[in-house]
From Swiss-Prot:
The keyword Metal-binding applies. Belongs to the ketol-acid reductoisomerase family. NADP(+) binds at residues 45-48, 68, 76, 78, 108-110, 158. Signal peptide: none annotated. Its cofactor is Mg(2+). This is Ketol-acid reductoisomerase (NADP(+)). Pathway: Amino-acid biosynthesis; L-isoleucine biosynthesis; L-isoleucine from 2-oxobutanoate: step 2/4; Amino-acid biosynthesis; L-valine biosynthesis; L-valine from pyruvate: step 2/4. Residues 15-208 form the KARI N-terminal Rossmann domain. Mg(2+) 2 binds at residues 217, 389, 393. The gene is ilvC.
Length: 491
């Protein structure tokens, strides 16, 4: 199979990369109505599979789970989760032929085998759903022409999808219809109903494309969302310990610092995050972030280029064919890092101390978010999509580090995200080694000394932060998410 994106001409590529429209709430007046009375069968019962299914059932849809026969016979975790929650469970052969919508929520690397197994069983005119378009765009999966192919991609982990729904809210969501598979013109109606059934319409839905979702999702998770947090954690911990900081304190400052810092980001963007610093610290964080952007821009651009060309997906799929030898080696190396094995700090670190002693971490977040956003937009991705794949998801990923350090982050994210994370972090750490030697007292582990501030410089920095394009689009999109809750687990 050929990479679908690479079969398109330039005009088609640009059109699909640039497809992005914020949908009005009135467009979801029928909510999940289009799918009521129809049979929805979910393949896969992981975090997204289970939690989307629970939401859809609570929205009045008929939901069942199709699992492999061996998973049922051996009563594997997927079978237990589905049955313990009262869902009907059956084999592919039992359930797929009656399904009006088959939702594939298995891991990326299983998509090809799953889709090839279910396609022959699907009835004429049924629909096939994804929550990530990798199989369609990067693998180039060919789907029967009578089948409608749609995507509903919540911009949060599965657990958050469920928790927000139970609060009567939802999470921001991208929806799309594959242009090669919409024979009856009902793809958008199906996608809208599915998104509403998960609660996404209450938080904001972007009409996107499979191409835009995949290329932006890969870029975000590889760079700022996971790769930058991993590289930053390793670099900052080693720097603190090398300068005599108690390893336990250093570990806690970093483990919970990302979450505390990005909670401000979630509530008020980069502007609020920077406003949590003293004026001297803000000026220093801005200067550091500009240095970081200059150093890292080529690395961000290389990742975007490799994602657009298909070089990234080709390399990762080659590793799949070798039983994940690279992925597993990188995972083992991360587990052996000093940060992952540092003792726990029993003392208290106040919320403000995370900012005061984490000026470099604030700078890393600012630089990473802006670079990811700018690089995606330069590649033709619309600003709203770039926002969701950079700034919006960052607090959720930081929250996983607060739970069990980098191990937890890499367990929670997909194997695709984990592979890309290691690629980026393994390049970023040596790239930033020299920069780390230039840090001043007060950049990390201590507060910035001095109180002198140049008014004109502070004015210019404030204006530069607030006028960055990601802040403009962020203010608009956060307006649709006013019911957000704090996700901090607090250290």
């Amino acid at each position: 199979m050929a990479n679908y994106f690479n079969t398109l001409n330039l005009r088609q590529q640009l059109a699909q990369l640039g497809k992005c429209r914020f949908m009005a709430r009135e467009e979801f007046a029928d909510e999940a109505g289009y799918l009521k009375g129809k049979k929805v069968v979910i393949v896969g019962c992981g975090a997204q599979g289970l939690n989307q299914g629970l939401n859809m059932r609570d929205s009045g849809l008929d939901v069942a789970y199709a699992l492999r026969k061996e998973a049922i016979d051996e009563k594997r975790p997927s079978w237990r989760k589905a049955t313990e929650n009262g869902f009907k469970v059956g084999t592919y052969e039992d359930l797929i032929p009656q399904a009006d919508l088959v939702v594939n929520l298995t891991p990326d690397k299983q998509h090809t085998s799953v889709v090839r197994a279910v396609q022959p069983l699907m009835k004429d005119g049924a629909a096939l759903g994804y929550s990530h378009g990798f199989n369609i765009v990067e693998v180039g999966e060919q789907v029967r022409k009578d089948i409608t192919v749609v995507m509903v991609a919540p911009k949060c982990p599965g657990t958050e999808v469920r928790e927000e729904y139970k609060r009567g809210f939802g999470v921001p969501t991208l929806i799309a219809v594959h242009p090669e598979n919409d024979p009856k013109g009902e793809g958008m109606a199906i996608a809208k109903a599915w998104a509403a059934a998960t609660g996404g319409h209450r938080a904001g839905v972007l009409e996107s494309s499979f191409v835009a979702e995949v290329k932006s999702d890969l870029m975000g998770e590889q760079t700022i969302l996971c790769g930058m947090l991993q590289a930053g954690s390793l670099l900052c911990f080693d720097k603190l310990v090398a300068e005599g900081t108690d390893p336990a304190y250093a570990e806690k400052l970093i483990q919970f610092g990302w979450e505390t810092i990005t909670e401000a980001l979630k509530q008020g963007g980069i502007t609020l995050m920077m406003d949590r610093l003293s004026n001297p610290a803000k000026l220093r964080a801005y200067a550091l972030s500009e240095q970081l952007k200059g150093i890292m821009a080529p690395l961000f651009q290389k990742h975007m280029d490799d994602i657009i060309s298909g070089a990234f997906s080709g390399g990762m799929m080659a590793d799949w064919a070798e039983d994940d030898v690279k992925l597993l080696n990188w995972r083992e190396e991360t587990g052996k890092s000093a940060f992952e094995n540092a003792p726990q700090f029993e003392g208290k670190i106040s919320e403000q101390e995370y900012f005061d002693h984490g000026v470099l971490m604030v700078a890393m977040v600012k630089a990473g978010v802006e670079l990811a956003f700018e690089t995606m937009v330069d590649a033709g991705i619309i600003e709203e999509s770039a926002y969701y794949e950079s700034l919006h998801e960052l607090p959720l990923i930081a929250n996983t580090i607060a739970r069990k350090r980098l191990y937890e982050m890499n367990v929670v994210i997909s194997d695709t995200a984990e592979y890309g994370n290691y690629l980026f972090a393994n390049a970023a750490v040596p790239l930033l080694k020299e920069f780390m030697t230039t840090l001043q007292a007060g950049d990390l582990g201590k507060s910035v000394a001095g109180t002198s501030v140049d008014n004109a410089q502070l004015r210019d920095v404030n204006e530069a932060v607030r006028n960055h394009p990601i802040e403009s689009v962020g203010r608009k999109l956060r307006g649709y998410m006013t019911d957000m809750k704090r996700i901090a687990v607090a250290g």
